[in-house]
Regions:
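Secretory targeting signals
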Residues: 1-3, 7
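Short aromatic/basic micro-patch
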Residues: 2, 357, 505
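Solvent-exposed loop/linker segments at secondary-structure transitions
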Residues: 40-49, 53-62, 115, 137-144, ...
Length: 548
């Protein structure tokens, strides 16, 4: 049985539960008044940083089951974020069966999903962000960051080429963002979206290839998009490396770090042939030092798509950064990691995925330096937040768009447009019931998820193959046992701009080499060499592996 709003407040212990605050409310927080301002967080510092990441196109509320396995190796073994289930609850001091336990772990997922409902939704996120800004004394005292992997991951984001998410983020009031899957549209499409975005799109670790700079074609393309994509020709930078923001009267430098392995993980030649990506630790240190010496900021923070292990290592080696706000690895970590380095301590956070959380960090800045902080990660429990009316209206109107011949779903001309969908609205297509499931379908897990099993089994059947492989990505929503599976659910697990499937013959030695190569990228002890994500999914063949 699901909880009533009154029951929910009782479970929260009148505001005592970590990460969710229930209070008496204020006239300025009318939208949250009906649920007693459970998300109103009193300001404890003088600059508030708000953080979302890896929403993967999920404008609507959804279910997302957290992993039951998240292996760490060497120095990361048994350390955050490689702690799950009851062990994580113990570390963060959360009671089993509570709303936070539902949000942060896989424990009793089906029962707690029935009890607490869906999570996320941009209408709900907008409402909570506005409340957090108001409780900080106004938007001028806050800064809203997006860690990327936002413009991809749903049917509507695919069909609009990410434009639906850009507009939604503008409505959220996102000030700064970085990218990864944002680059898996054609370069011109990415630059068009960057121009449409009202905030700052950063990337200190992205470069323009020399061949592109030597010719005229790239420069001509950037001119069409108001110079976006050619921030500094001398430094071969397509995007700003950092921006200075005034937050509560304090100058905060925000550095952007795109996913460093984008060129390895995604098809560079087709989507972004003129750009290169890298970790660029030395350049990061040089940039931080330069900012500290010449800009004289009160704080330096990084909005990062490195992945949490990489952020932790970088924080231990680069001096002068106050905090990392991370993404990529979808680690919903309510407890920050404090990392010691030669210059002091850097705080590392990661705000999960699918619109499930908002990270809130209040910085205390005294005499032009950070002297302390408080951090909360708020789970967005859909049923207990009144959605923002303007956002709901935008989403509804966008979903009422009709699928037409201009929609591009794939690289292949033969598959780029689906004739069966022509003339139907996006909502009509996505709300189609496909089947029901008697077991929970989920994506997260180091070696397999039930959604992945459905996908690889389907590939085997469709192509009459002996076995099938599918990438171990971490994006994709869940469907609890007993629920209907809709086209929306399927699209949130398959929507990418290069989703074509292929059939080929492999010898055993070739297959073994492929699996070992993937495992090496995932489980190597040095975080700088890890690609993130999970092991390739297999159907029709079993294997044994010793990741250590």
């Amino acid at each position: 049985m699901s909880l009533t709003r009154r029951d929910f407040i009782k479970v929260l212990g009148a505001g005592s539960a970590a990460g969710l605050i229930s209070g008496c409310g204020s006239d300025a927080s009318a939208k949250l008044a009906s649920q007693d301002n459970m998300y109103e967080v009193p300001k404890t510092g003088n600059a508030r940083i708000l953080h979302i990441t890896d929403t993967h196109g999920n404008l609507l509320p959804n279910y997302f089951r957290e992993p039951n396995v998240n292996l760490g190796f060497g120095p990361t073994y048994g350390q955050l974020p490689h702690v799950v289930g009851n062990n994580l609850l113990k570390q963060i001091g959360v009671k089993p069966g509570s709303p936070e336990a539902y949000a942060f772990t896989y424990n009793n997922f089906e029962d707690l999903a029935a009890k607490y409902g869906k999570t996320g939704g941009f209408g709900q996120i907008k409402t909570v962000l506005e409340s957090l800004r108001e409780s900080a004394g106004g938007v001028q005292n806050t800064l809203t960051l997006d860690g990327g992997d936002t413009w991809q991951g749903s049917g509507t984001s695919l069909w609009t080429r990410g434009a639906d998410m850009v507009e939604a983020c503008n409505m959220l009031g996102v000030d700064v963002m970085v990218g990864h899957w944002e680059f898996t549209y054609k370069e011109a499409e990415t630059l068009k979206n960057v121009g449409f975005f009202k905030g700052d799109f950063l990337g200190q670790n992205v470069r323009i290839l020399e061949d592109a700079l030597m010719g005229d074609e790239y420069a001509t393309m950037t001119e069409k998009y108001d110079g976006n994509g050619l921030y500094s020709e001398d430094d071969a930078m397509p995007f700003k490396p950092y921006v200075i923001k005034n937050v509560g009267g304090h100058r905060i430098a925000v550095i952007g770090q795109a996913f460093p392995r984008t060129s390895n993980a995604n098809p560079q030649k087709y989507f972004f042939p003129d750009w290169s990506f890298g970790l660029r630790e030395d350049e990061m240190q040089e940039l931080v030092t330069d900012i500290r010496e010449n800009e004289k900021p009160d704080a330096v923070i990084v909005i990062s798509h490195n992945g949490m292990d990489v952020d932790i290592k970088m924080a231990s080696r680069v001096v002068g950064i106050d905090a990392f706000f991370g993404g990529h690895t979808h680690d919903g970590m309510p407890k920050p990691v404090e990392v010691k380095n030669a210059g002091g301590v850097t705080v590392v956070t990661n705000a999960g995925c699918s619109g499930k959380y908002i990270g809130v960090m209040d910085l205390n800045i005294v005499d032009h330096k950070v002297t302390g902080y408080e951090y909360k990660m708020l789970p967005i429990l859909t049923d207990f937040v009144k959605p923002d009316a303007a956002m709901v209206s935008f989403i509804s109107k966008m979903r009422n768009t009709k699928y037409d011949k201009n929609v591009v779903e794939a690289r292949s001309a033969a598959m780029s447009n689906n004739p069966d969908r022509l003339g139907k609205t996006y909502d009509e297509i996505l709300t189609e019931k496909l089947c029901s499931t008697n077991q929970t379908l989920y994506r997260r897990g180091n070696f397999m998820g039930t959604w992945d099993q459905v996908l690889v089994n389907s590939l085997r059947e469709e192509h009459d193959a002996d076995f099938a492989m599918s990438a171990g990505v971490r994006w994709g929503t869940s469907v609890p046992a007993g629920h209907d599976v809709t086209m929306e659910d399927l699209m949130t697990n398959t929507s990418m701009t290069y989703g074509e499937t292929y059939v080929s013959e492999l010898k055993g030695a070739q297959l073994k080499e492929i699996l070992e190569g993937i495992a090496e990228n995932l489980f190597v002890q040095d975080p700088y060499l890890q690609s993130g994500g999970d092991m390739v999914r297999m159907g029709g063949m079993d294997y044994t592996i010793d990741p250590a």
